[in-house]
Design a protein with these regions (language model features):
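N-terminal pre-domain/capping segments
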Residues: 1-82, 111, 118, 152, ...
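Acidic/histidine-rich catalytic cores of soluble enzymes
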Residues: 9-10, 44, 107-189
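Flexible loop residues that form catalytic
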Residues: 15, 49, 88, 129, ...
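Short, small-residue-enriched loops and turns at beta-alpha junctions
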Residues: 17-20, 51-52, 90-92, 131-136, ...
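Charged helix-capping and loop-helix junction motifs
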Residues: 23-29, 60-68, 99-110, 139-144, ...
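Short, basic/glycine-rich phosphate-binding loops at helix/coil junctions
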Residues: 48, 84, 89-90, 123-124, ...
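Short amphipathic alpha-helical segments at helix-loop
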Residues: 56, 94-98, 128
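Hydrophobic alpha-helical segments and helix pairs
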Residues: 75-102
Length: 189
């Protein structure tokens, strides 16, 4: 139905499609289903599960890096060239934890991830999430600043009309970040 309606592709979650925590045989089943679909799936969202924390006092960098490496390798195999890093549960800053330190943890993760993504032909796009879903990297301007800080072509920006409308972001911030855009979500408030 989506193909008949004129859609070009569909977007599915990393956790449901690429399944970085699952055995290769489980991923192979999902891959076969996607390959049989009438539309391709070049983009995956929901990158990190909520229990794989990127911020806070207990972050397992080795587990994050292994998960990300598997996700990127499977993305390449599946023809996925863009992975959306919204992952509000994973990046949520724990109460009382230093926000600047949390942003530094996210930047460090993205810097480690960038060469892995690049090696597999994948671009990671940071998704600004409205304040009701996450307490860090909520605006296009904040995510654009982080994208520039990481400074790697494998890390770009997603813009989502729903989140920017909910946050009441000025259109000038959206326009200023436009050179960093790789992907867009369209929804209404």
């Amino acid at each position: 139905a989506a193909a008949a309606a004129g859609f070009d592709y569909f977007e599915w979650s990393v956790q449901a499609f690429l399944q970085p925590r699952a055995e290769a045989s489980t991923f192979a089943q999902a891959l076969a289903a996607v390959r049989a679909a009438p539309l391709p799936c070049p983009v995956c969202n929901c990158f990190l599960p909520g229990d794989l924390k990127v911020t806070g006092p207990v972050v397992d960098d080795a587990a994050l890096d292994a998960y990300a490496a598997t996700a990127c390798a499977r993305a390449a195999e599946a023809g996925v060239d863009t992975i959306v890093f919204g992952s509000g549960g994973a990046r949520q800053v724990p109460e009382g934890f230093n926000r600047a330190r949390a942003e530094g943890q996210i930047a460090a993760f993205l810097r480690r991830l960038a060469p892995v993504a690049r090696r597999h032909g994948v671009v990671i796009v940071i998704e600004p999430l409205r304040t009701g879903e996450c307490n860090i990297l909520n605006t296009v301007a904040e995510c654009a600043r982080l994208t520039r800080l990481v400074d790697d072509k494998a890390i770009r920006l997603l813009v989502d009309g729903y989140h920017w409308a909910c946050n009441g972001e000025p259109e000038t911030d959206i326009a200023a970040a436009a050179p960093l855009f790789r992907h867009m979500h369209v929804a209404t408030k």
